[in-house]
From Swiss-Prot:
Belongs to the protein-tyrosine phosphatase family. Non-receptor class PTPDC1 subfamily. This is Protein tyrosine phosphatase domain-containing protein 1. Residues 11-21 have a biased composition (Polar residues). Residues 82-253 form the Tyrosine-protein phosphatase domain. The modification Phosphoserine is found at S392, S394, S543. It comes from the Eukaryota. The lineage of its organism: Eukaryota, Metazoa, Chordata, Craniata, Vertebrata. It comes from Mus musculus. Residues 1-36, 549-570 are annotated as: Disordered. GO terms for molecular function: protein tyrosine phosphatase activity.
Length: 747
């Protein structure tokens, strides 16, 4: 983004870093990031002719943004270009030119730094009066072919200078960035690499980490000073955040809540978020149904589950948490210094109240700085890196937190463990989906000062009593398994048996109490994952599919932290029971699909399902972590709960009436439905077929439960027999046809 007519008081990068001038870009009344220009200044930038703006703003042909001599080495992450690393993998930069590419060997620098993609947000012919002359072939100051010939991907999204793009266009750009980051590092540029570039990177951070808009703006400005310049650009990031909120909602009755939708509406939302192969694969099938059916078959066949690395998100979350915390704290400290008023006695209650009432600079939207993963998921705060902040808050900051508490909000400064322990004591599920009440928190000022910014250091984890059910795998460890081997066996009992000659499964509470044994937080995550650099996953309590055995995980080398220990040294390997036959495993998986959970405590399953509902609503990483859930009853209950919470049944009364009236042939009946309907139904029926030959009563139970979930009609209701007879005939014929096709393909 061209910087336009820069304010006379704009500080250079070095000044911003040394004097922390970032706070100057915050609105003093609301504490939110403020635009860099006045309203009049913004208006002028839209009416001044381009050649005049270039001459007045950056020197015309002597454009400072294309002159490396104007920038320090610190401001040239890529030598020869005004550039900054916003994250370890995303580079914000001014536009390069053919002259600079050759003189500073920028393409070689890109390859050396691992940059595999360059994203250009300019329009051809833009800023023709700035810096180097434009290349006639491309309309830019360089030829894109120069990068592409070197194996670097090139994308161009034309974005008007000082303008904003549509939300759907930004979403497309963000998805391209997401794909590009899977290949390597990404460089983004416009003209100066400040406005449009900053907006796109901030929107990507919102998309990838679910942080708030203001957090993203603060973070980008901290890494790339003077970024995101106009009111429209600030509003663009905030509206993009609001635009994503309903799209991410999986379970409408769980926090963060959204309006219930139909299957067709959900598939439209899903298409907005998915990209690449996954978008094509799941065009007409909900992701949760496809994934659960796949995991169920993996469990039945005892196949390994391959998990891709999700390292970028958690590491980035930790970096963002640290940077935003420091920036907001810095702003508060500078405001207090500017007031230059006498500090009342902090131990005098009267003076304390008076100071609070006279506090005229309060972050009225402080919840905007509260990280989403803290505000919604207090129990999952630990970042991958063990960041130990040696900071404390002043008395006025403590009163601000007290005010937020009185308004019913969760202060982001409250020690995480204290919030968690208190909230777990007050959680009472009130509906089918998990909806924890806002806890009434009690804490003293001394505890707050002592624990401020010490988020989930290893010593903060405590025991597993309050964490094992709602921990976060990817926010608790840096070692991400590439493959998780399902080696737990099926069991037909509720309790775990133990062979005398095998080690006894450990007591996790005692392990955490022994600092010599464990120095790294190993909080059990949903589905039995144990975060930390472990080589042996441990799960408790036992379920029919994994009782008495232990899965194996392989981790990449070289990622262990200094204070991490091998769990295999501290935790004995759980004993293995003789595995059930393949047929027995398939039958048990089918019973889970039919909701015949006679071997599992229903309350335990319900609790786990509610927890997963909350996880999937709140965190993108939950899709990866759920692959580690080894209890088919939990997986199937989760899938059916999603089907049942839709605004309308998958198969409506009108659909059943149509099938009855047309007396449709069973072979063609499903194709009379909408494509999303029959593809969703076929996904479940294919899962049943893949379980191979099942006892008649088990298969019958699977079909009956599927009909009940898809129609929301009970068999004993008024039209129940007609609905069940019609659909059962169609479903059974589909199963027979699929089995016949499978048999023919093998012969």
């Amino acid at each position: 983004m061209a910087a336009g007519v820069l304010p006379q008081n704009e500080d250079p990068y070095s000044t911003l870093v040394n004097s922390s001038g970032h706070a100057a870009h915050m609105d003093e009344n609301s504490g939110r990031p403020a635009p860099k220009y006045t309203k009049v200044g913004e208006r002028l930038r839209h009416v001044i002719p381009g050649h005049m703006a270039c001459s007045m703003a950056c020197g015309g042909r002597a454009c400072k943004y294309e002159n490396p001599a104007r920038w320090s080495e610190q401001e040239q992450a890529i030598k020869g270009v005004y550039s900054s690393w916003v994250t370890d993998n995303i580079l914000a930069m001014a536009r390069p030119s053919s002259e600079l590419l050759e003189k500073y060997r920028i393409i070689e620098q890109f390859l050396g730094q691992g940059i595999k993609t360059i994203i250009n947000l300019q329009r051809p012919g833009e800023h023709a009066s700035c810096g180097s002359a434009l290349e006639q072939e491309s309309g830019f100051t360089y030829l894109p072919e120069a990068f592409m010939e070197a194996g670097i991907y090139f994308y161009n999204f034309g974005w008007k200078d000082y303008g904003v793009a549509s939300l759907t266009a930004i979403l497309d750009m963000v998805k391209v960035m997401t794909f590009a980051l899977q290949e390597g590092k990404v460089a983004v540029h416009c003209h100066a690499g400040l406005g449009r570039t900053g907006v796109l990177i901030a929107c990507y951070l919102v998309f990838a980490t679910r942080m708030t808009a203001d957090q993203a703006i603060i973070f980008v400005r901290a890494k790339r000073p003077n970024s995101i310049q106009t009111r429209g650009q600030l509003l663009c990031v905030r509206e993009f955040t609001q635009f994503l909120a309903p799209l991410r909602n999986i379970f409408s009755c769980c926090d963060p809540k959204a309006h219930a939708v139909t299957l067709a509406q959900y598939l439209i939302r899903q298409r907005h978020l998915l990209h690449g192969y996954e978008a094509r694969l799941l065009k007409y099938v909900p992701k949760i149904i496809h994934l659960v059916c796949k995991l169920l078959l993996d469990l039945a066949e005892n196949r390994p589950v391959v998990m891709k690395s999700m390292l970028e998100g958690p590491v980035l979350s930790a970096e963002i948490e640290k940077t935003v915390s420091e920036m907001v704290t810095l702003q508060l400290d500078q405001e207090l210094l500017r007031q230059n008023s006498d500090v009342p006695d902090p131990f005098n209650p009267t003076a304390e109240v008076a100071e609070f009432e006279n506090q005229d600079v309060i972050l009225s939207t402080e919840q905007e700085f509260d990280p989403l993963w803290k505000r919604r998921d207090i129990e999952c705060l630990q970042p991958l890196t063990h960041l130990k902040r040696q900071l404390s808050y002043s008395d006025s900051d403590l009163k601000r937190a007290k005010a937020i508490l009185e308004q019913g909000e969760t202060p982001w400064t409250v020690p995480a463990q204290e919030l968690l322990d208190h909230s777990l004591q007050h959680q009472k599920p009130t509906s089918h989906c998990y909806m924890p009440p806002t806890p009434e928190l009690g804490f003293n000022k001394e505890a707050l000062v002592q624990n401020t910014f010490s988020f989930w250091t290893p010593s903060k984890c405590g025991g597993l009593e309050g964490l094992k059910d709602e921990g976060s795998l990817l926010l608790c460890r840096k070692d991400i398994p590439k493959e998780v081997q399902r080696s737990r066996t099926f069991s037909v009992g509720v309790s775990c048996s133990h062979n005398p000659g095998e080690p006894v499964p450990p007591n996790f509470t005692s392990i955490h109490k022994d600092p010599e044994q464990v120095t790294h937080c190993r909080c059990e995550a949903p589905g039995g994952w144990v975060p930390g650099p472990v080589h042996e996953m441990v799960r408790s309590p036992c379920s029919p599919l994994n009782c008495g055995s232990s899965p194996k995980a392989q981790f990449p080398h070289g990622q262990e932290t200094q204070d991490s220990t091998d769990l295999s040294e501290a935790v004995p390997h759980a004993g293995l029971q003789p595995e059930l036959s393949a047929e027995a495993r398939r039958i048990l998986a089918a019973k889970a699909l039919a909701n015949l959970n006679e071997f599992v405590e229903k309350e335990e399953v319900k609790r786990k399902v509610e927890m997963w509902q909350k996880e999937l609503n709140s965190r993108e990483e939950a899709w990866e972590r759920i692959c580690g859930e080894r209890d088919p009853f939990i997986l199937c209950s989760l899938m059916w709960s999603w089907v049942e919470q839709l605004k309308e049944p998958v198969i409506t009364k009108e659909d059943v009436d149509m099938l009855v009236d047309r007396q449709a042939d069973a072979a063609e009946a499903l194709f009379l439905l909408e494509k999303g309907q029959y593809q969703t139904i076929l996904c479940v029926l294919h899962c049943i077929v893949s379980l191979q030959t099942l006892p008649m009563e088990v298969e019958e139970a699977c079909l009956l439960h599927a009909i009940k979930a898809f129609t929301k009609v009970n068999f004993d209701s008024e039209n129940g027999p007609i609905v069940y007879d019609t659909l059962k005939k169609i479903f059974k014929h589909t199963l027979e046809e699929k089995r016949k096709m499978a048999k023919d393909s093998l012969s």
